[in-house]
Amino acid sequence: MNQLNHPYHLVNISPWPLATGMGAFAMTSGLVKWFHSFDSMLFFTGINNNHICFDQWWRDVSREATFQGMHSTKVGFGLRWGMILFIISEVFFFVSFFWGFFHSSLSPNIEVGALWPPSEVESFLSALLNTSILLASGVTVTWAHHALMENNFDQCLQGLLFTVLLGLYFSFLQGLEYMEASFTIADSIYGSTFFLATGFHGLHVLIGTIFLMICILRHAKCYFSQHHFGFEAAAWYWHFVDVVWLFLYLSIYWWGE
């Protein structure tokens, strides 16, 4: 079948979709355990499993594209549309969280004292810093992309490194914010909507950071050419994460407070 005269890429059997699904199941199950005051070992085991699977899966895709020549013009067109539709699906995923937040905040019920935010909920001063960090990371990833198009190896590498460091710093500050919060996910609808929306965004930041780390490894090995959709997809995803955070900041942290 792989020798047929057609422009499509018939992929070989791969263990990574199944292994990634098992890791995702371990993550979600471990998160439920963690929320109910059990240990967090299963959750972090799932994270480590998925990190390894992402690394190996991207390695295979890079080999197919760079060394085996499997990504024809038709395949590249399909990959671009696949990434666009994936980001659109993620937009609607976050729309559900914003819907839940505004549904609860515009007409708070008696369970939260008919107040929004509920009493005893303190504002977060780190949110504005996180916003500036993500906006700066959007600038650095754009800088890296333009440097790549201009065949400037060093500036592209610097831009990618700065973007990854800013993403890791954002995740670190988000973790500190969660630890210092005066409420939990179990504290009323406010806690549920806050931690679900910001937590899933934080997960997307981690995924985008891993995506950019893979781009650093590929760039260091000189895999990128004038055809570098892997880098473009990472940049699209990172800008999507930036825009979602702007809406989260304006809705939950600024207007919601």
Curated annotation (Swiss-Prot):
Annotated compartments: Mitochondrion inner membrane
A Pfam family this chain is assigned to: COX3
Main location: mitochondrion
Reaction(s) the record says it catalyses: 4 Fe(II)-[cytochrome c] + O2 + 8 H(+)(in) = 4 Fe(III)-[cytochrome c] + 2 H2O + 4 H(+)(out)
Taxonomy, superkingdom: Eukaryota
UniProt entry tagged with the keyword Mitochondrion: yes
Top-level EC class: translocase
Cellular component terms (Gene Ontology): mitochondrial inner membrane
Subunit note: Component of the cytochrome c oxidase (complex IV, CIV), a multisubunit enzyme composed of a catalytic core of 3 subunits and several supernumerary subunits. The complex exists as a monomer or a dimer and forms supercomplexes (SCs) in the inner mitochondrial membrane with ubiquinol-cytochrome c oxidoreductase (cytochrome b-c1 complex, complex III, CIII).
Family (UniProt): Belongs to the cytochrome c oxidase subunit 3 family.
Entry function: Component of the cytochrome c oxidase, the last enzyme in the mitochondrial electron transport chain which drives oxidative phosphorylation. The respiratory chain contains 3 multisubunit complexes succinate dehydrogenase (complex II, CII), ubiquinol-cytochrome c oxidoreductase (cytochrome b-c1 complex, complex III, CIII) and cytochrome c oxidase (complex IV, CIV), that cooperate to transfer electrons derived from NADH and succinate to molecular oxygen, creating an electrochemical gradient over the inner membrane that drives transmembrane transport and the ATP synthase.
Protein name as catalogued: Cytochrome c oxidase subunit 3
Gene: COIII
